[in-house]
Every structure is written in C-alpha cells, then in structure tokens.
Amino acid sequence: MTLSEIQRTLEKCETVPTRSLGQNFLHDQNLARWIVGCLQIQPGDHIIEIGPGLGALTEFLAPHDIRLTLIEKDGRLVRHLEEKFRSPTVEVLHLDALDYDLRQAWGKGPVKVVGNLPYYVSTPLIAKFTSALSPASRLVLTLQLELARRLNAEPRTKDYGAMTVCVNRRWEASFLRKLPASVFVPAPKVDSAVIALERRPADRVRPLDESLFDPLVRRGFSERRKQLRNLVPELKSRWADVAAALRVPETVRAEELSLAQWETLTDIARPSAAQSGQEMFDVVDECDRVLRAEPRDIVHVNNLLHRAVHMLLFNSRGDLLLQKRSIWKDRNPGRWDASAAGHLDSGENYPEAARRELREELGVEAPALERIGKLTPCEQTGWEFIEIFRGVHDGPFAPASLEVETVAFFNREHVKAWAAGSPQDFSPVFLLCQAFL
C-alpha cells in the first residue's frame, strides 16, 4: 500500500494508528512484495498472517493458491480486511494472536507464518509459533532490530542470550535485512529488521531431554555476570570434570557456551537412568498365543508377531488427547498418534502394559480403562496384535521428553477431518484406531 492508500483507508475506517497496539503500517510496496517472497510459498500452503493491519502484505499473499488466515486484534480493521479479501480460502479472525488456538491450524496444509509483530509482544509470539504444538515450518517476521539481532547472535556477544540458544535449538535463524523507520507510517522510534526462522530437520537436532534443556539455559543466563558454576549448584562438586568435557575454563559464563556446549551440559546434568538390559518381547502365533521371548531388535528385524497397546484418553468434554511422537523415534517420527502406546514386555499382559505406558509416556496413573477393540497383525500395525483401551483423564500430563514432542486435546470431528485430508500427519496405526473413536 502507498502512503495515499493508507491515508484513504484509515479515513474510510474512521480510525487512526493506535500506539498501544503497536500499529506502524508498511507503505513500501516493493518491500512488501519482497517480504512475501521470503516465505517461499508453495501451492496448497496455509499462510497465517499476524497483525495484517490494512493489508500491505496481504495484497501480495492473496493471489497465491493458498489458504490464508488473517489474525487481527483491532476490530476497526477487521471489517476492512473481510471486505477487501473476501474469499472462500481467506479466514479473518478478530483476536489477539497470543490467543490463537494452534490446534486449529493442523490439517489445513503446510503452515508458514508472516507478520509485522508489535514490538511489545514479539517475544511471546515467537515462543508460541515456534513451540512444539505449532505446525509452522517457516516464519518470516518483522521485528525490532534489537530482538532480530538477539535471535541471530553469536556466543560471546552482548546480544547472545537464553532466547538465542532456546530458539536456535529447533530453528535456523537468518537475519534477512534491516528496515529503516521511514518505511512505516507512523514511523516507529526504532529501526526494524526482517528475520526468517526455518524449522530444522530431525537429523540436525540433537536428541536431548528438553524438559531439562530450557530451564538450564534460562538459569544460566539469569545472572550473566556470574560464573556458570555458581548457577548450577548440582554440578559444582564436579565442575572441573564438567568444564573439561565442555573444553572451557572453569570460570566460563553462560554467554561463552555455544548451542552444542549447552546441549552437552544438559546431558551431563541429566540424572543417570538405571541401566536396563535389552527389551524382551513375547513372540506370538496367529492366535496371539505366546511362543517364546526374543530381543526387541530381533522381533522387529524379522517381522515376528508380537503385542502392543494403544490408549485413547478423552477429557470430560469428550475431546481426544493426541501425542506428537518424538522426532527421534525410529518409527513414524514426528507424527501424531494415540494418547499413549507401547509394546508389551515379555510376561506382561495387555492391561498391565496399558497402565505402565500411561505412567512412562504421560506421567499419569491409569484411569479406569475400558478395552474397546483389537487390531490383528499386518504391515500397517508393524506385525503387532494391538489391544485398544479407552479412558477419561483431564490431566495435567508430564510427557516423556525423549518420547513425546507434545500432547494436546483435539475435537474428535476435527481429528477425523484432519486425518482424512492429511493422513501423512498420523501414524499408520492411529489411522486404524480411528474406527474406535
């Protein structure tokens, strides 16, 4: 939009930019076109635009063969957006982007996010749209220059901090360009920058207990001037060995550790788990009768018939709890699945395994579980007899970090429509379990 178009539109809407909403409207059309180009849009993408305002970016998004969701907090501008971009593939939501339900975005195509973020809420918005529940694969954001530099900072610099480390663990941050205040109206008091965040593929994310990683990093940066050993007292008695493993002096501070060193420190800080032997499964015949016990690897490599359980937990409103499998799983990594699932150990029965898996994967004691069905072995089940259990539980849950990316309750009808349109988002076994919803 040009300056004159912005002025006419504001007059038509009988409004003026509101400082409390962080409204600074982009008036450089070439720049708007360039920002949209940075999204690397593909046909069928679902683009979420945060704070479209008068539609400077939306004008260049709308012509694409995409689904478009516009999230606008200012009710004065919502009607303008609805009228200007009316289309079956465009949805305008009148709400704060912090209140947007990320679950709504699943099942609508590959998600990318764009927006000129209000500076006062940029950090929580980035945290939200880069969270484990977010379906986004790429974000192109206009931010305050200071924040953009923090996301792209290097160790041993003043901009490097907890946010740098935590975001860059799962996302590749790229500083695209600096924007002068003059390209906005009204001009903000600070310069801005455009950054891109690209989700890292699984082979570029080190397996790690992330329930320990984020708190450890934030604790380390909580007092930047302090030596790190004074902020992790649980490691202080063996700090000389820790520093040697990290290849740093014992006087190291948080800002001197790279992402890889923070990951190593997390592994060191993780309590040692009791060593267990090779998992043993019962091999069964076509009638599910136990023949013998074999190690897990032998069972899987040779496609021997064995046993497993899948649990479908519902909350008191009837919504279904789904888990997103860890990206490090050897089978169906990163896909959505039943609330909890797992193999039977040798000598274990189905109900015992169901209760154990709920404890291990979700950190809850089993509610009253009802057996609702059984799947027979086939390639899709991984040659498993699978008993399916149903239960009611409202949480809270404590997902096992190395096993589960996240969990969330979804409306059952949403899940059915999502699975029908995007079956690749789910494990093959869950698609079979749908018959029991």
What do these predicted regions represent?
Residues 308-340:
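A glycine-rich, hydrophobic loop/mini-helix early in the fold
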Residues 193, 197-199, 204-241, 249-260:
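An accessory alpha-helical subdomain
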Residues 330-364:
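Helix-adjacent hinge/juxtasegments
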Residues 51, 303, 317, 355, ...:
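Active-site segment of metal-dependent pyrophosphate-handling enzymes
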Residues 91-93, 174, 370-372, 408-410:
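General small-molecule cofactor/ligand-binding pocket signal
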Residues 295-297, 334, 373-437:
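Nudix hydrolase/Nudix homology domain
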Residues 276-310, 316:
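Acidic, metal-coordinating catalytic segment for phosphate/diphosphate chemistry
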Residues 1-215, 244, 264-267, 271-273:
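Catalytic cores of RNA-modifying enzymes
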